């Protein structure tokens, strides 16, 4: 299983990388824009934060296949081994096919249906990123879509994997893992929600109080 953080906040990546067993960091144009840093400045800093073994994801901006391929090559030259995120449009599918031949690893992003995700996988994307909460927000069933996509990939594109994205709650992320997803990416607020459990703090405080009442201190 691969766990990623969905952010370009270098300080938060450094903080959470000490706690979470993260495999790397995913970004998108909106996330990079929010950082107020040039993508060419922030990507090396993120790579340094996750270490040489961590995997970094960044997205192209062009709308046509030729431009996507050119941008993907620039990203790969800047950060060797980076996974290039390509929106799963008609032009995006063409770009994914071309990049597969070039040996550049891709992720099919902005996936709103299982069929769309399957096409990305068949085109050669190693990862496929369904937008769970955004599907829910449009009146769909994000978890069911992920379940369908996971089954399709297992049957027809076993070399590709679902990297589920767009979460508002830890429950959504867990449901994707229960559906068999091998990878998820968490926004910072959802990652923090997983850590903040009031009942745990209450239990620890009770342990400490009982120990102190018995022994007068909190030492072993």
Swiss-Prot record:
Biological process, per Gene Ontology: fructose metabolic process
Record keywords: Carbohydrate metabolism, Cytoplasm, Lyase, Schiff base
Main localization (coarse): cytoplasm
Top EC class for this record: lyase
Catalytic residues, chain numbering: 85 (schiff-base intermediate with substrate)
GO molecular function, one term: fructose 6-phosphate aldolase activity
Annotated PROSITE patterns: TRANSALDOLASE_1, TRANSALDOLASE_2
EC number(s) recorded for this UniProt protein: 4.1.2.-
Superkingdom to which the source organism belongs: Bacteria
GO CC term (a single one): cytoplasm
Transmembrane segments: none
Localization per record: Cytoplasm
Reactions it catalyzes: beta-D-fructose 6-phosphate = dihydroxyacetone + D-glyceraldehyde 3-phosphate
Ranges in coiled-coil conformation: none
InterPro entries, per database record: Aldolase_TIM, F6P_aldolase, TAL/FSA, Transaldolase_3B/F6P_aldolase, Transaldolase_AS, TSA/FSA_arc/bac
Pfam families: TAL_FSA
Job of this protein: Catalyzes the reversible formation of fructose 6-phosphate from dihydroxyacetone and D-glyceraldehyde 3-phosphate via an aldolization reaction.
Quaternary structure note: Homodecamer.
Family under the similarity heading: Belongs to the transaldolase family. Type 3A subfamily.
Name the UniProt record assigns to this protein: Fructose-6-phosphate aldolase
Source species of the chain: Salmonella typhimurium (strain LT2 / SGSC1412 / ATCC 700720)
């Amino acid at each position: 299983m691969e766990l990623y953080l969905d952010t370009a906040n270098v300080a938060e990546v450094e903080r959470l990388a000490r706690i979470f067993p993260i495999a790397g960091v995913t970004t998108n144009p909106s996330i990079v824009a929010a950082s107020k840093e040039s993508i060419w400045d922030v990507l090396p800093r993120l790579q340094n934060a996750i270490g040489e073994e961590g995997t970094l994801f960044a997205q192209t901006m062009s709308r046509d296949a030729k431009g996507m391929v050119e941008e993907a090559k620039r990203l790969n030259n800047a950060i060797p081994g980076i996974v290039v995120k390509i929106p799963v449009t008609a032009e995006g599918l063409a770009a994914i096919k071309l990049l597969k031949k070039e040996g550049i690893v891709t992720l099919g992003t902005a996936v709103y249906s299982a069929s769309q995700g399957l096409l990305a996988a068949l085109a050669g994307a190693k990862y496929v990123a369904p937008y769970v909460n955004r599907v829910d927000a449009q009146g769909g069933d994000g978890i069911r879509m992920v379940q369908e996509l996971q089954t399709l990939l297992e049957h027809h594109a076993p070399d590709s994997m679902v990297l589920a994205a767009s979460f508002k709650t830890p429950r959504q992320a867990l449901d994707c893992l229960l559906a068999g997803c091998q990878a998820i990416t968490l926004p910072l607020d959802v990652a923090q929600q997983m850590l903040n459990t009031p009942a745990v703090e209450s239990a620890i405080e009770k342990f400490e109080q009982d120990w102190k009442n018995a022994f007068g201190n909190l030492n072993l």
